[in-house]
Amino acid sequence: MLKADIQLRLSRLTLDTAFTVAAGEVLALLGPNGSGKSTTLRALVGLLPLAGGRVVLDGTVLEDPAQHVKVPPEKRPIGLMFQDYLLFPHLSAVENVAFGLRAKGTDKKTARQKATQTLARLGLEGALTSARPGAMSGGQQQRVAMARALVTEPKLLLLDEPLAALDVSTKTDVRRLLREVLRRSNAANVLVTHDLLDAVALGDRMVVIGDGKIVQTGTPAEVTSRPRSRYVADLVGVNLLQGTARGTVLDVDGGGQIVTAAAASGPILATVSPTAVAVSRQRPEGHEPNTWAGQISAVDLMGDRVRVRINGTPEITAEVSPRAVDDLKLDDGGELWASVSPSAITVYPP
């Protein structure tokens, strides 16, 4: 088990995070660029010295500044996998995988045998084991990098955006393979990604980092069903409103007021699916609650649907069909009315 309490200060970031990862578990770290995800991995490896806290792996203290304990990076039982692979271009696949074992003192014959066996587990056999990275596809290079990270049987496996450099078709196959590998692993696994699909498909738990601090944690279902930051809401694809509830009335921070079906009191978060936002060029007839106007600020194609950002009070995004874009002339901008049924609004505590 990994027990990490990481406190460090850089010129651009102060990182203060604490989490645990059980053996065989996959913890997915998400967050916007510069939030501290990769910095967390570098701290676990030992490349960035802690200012406070401690890192303990299977009962062994890897770092504790208060006790003046710091195990060097090369002595830590950690496997690493990066988005750009970092394979040696002059070595074959089997030589790349065997390198870590040789560096730890394993004899050449045994290292090659273990490297060959690990590559075979990942579907690379025969002539491919003798190929150099330049003669391999992106997916094949990723399998070599995966084998290199696994062959030393690390107690902690760190994966930094491992699928980011792959094309869509290759990514699907490698994601499936990586999921199988991680499910068989006895290591504690930490995955850094900006891709929600990777986090949901591979992670047992998710930790969302913002500005060096943990802003949300839970299972993928818990995090995605109740986002607590604009970042997560954008990943999931829902509108997130924050404000103060008085019964079924929510005073939205930044301006605006909406009516909800569920009553609440005090600080509250509310989500609205863009598909639940109706739009029109004219004010809808009747006196339905949750109807307001705003200026169109963005029109973005998302697959076979279109997202329309309305800069009103509150600001909100609607999802419409391409035909609605033409019928309402949304590309021309201008004023647009938004309507949301109270029953389409989910409220929960922050």
Regions found by a protein language model. Name each.
Residues 19-23:
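Conserved hydrophobic segment flanking the Walker A/P-loop of ABC-type ATPase nucleotide-binding domains
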Residues 28, 70-72, 76-86, 98, ...:
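ABC nucleotide-binding domain signature
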Residues 30-32:
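The feature captures the beta-strand-to-loop junction immediately N-terminal to the Walker
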Residues 45:
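Helix-to-loop junction immediately C-terminal to a conserved catalytic motif
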Residues 54-76, 107:
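ABC ATPase NBD Q-loop/coupling interface
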Residues 77, 92-231:
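ABC ATPase nucleotide-binding domains
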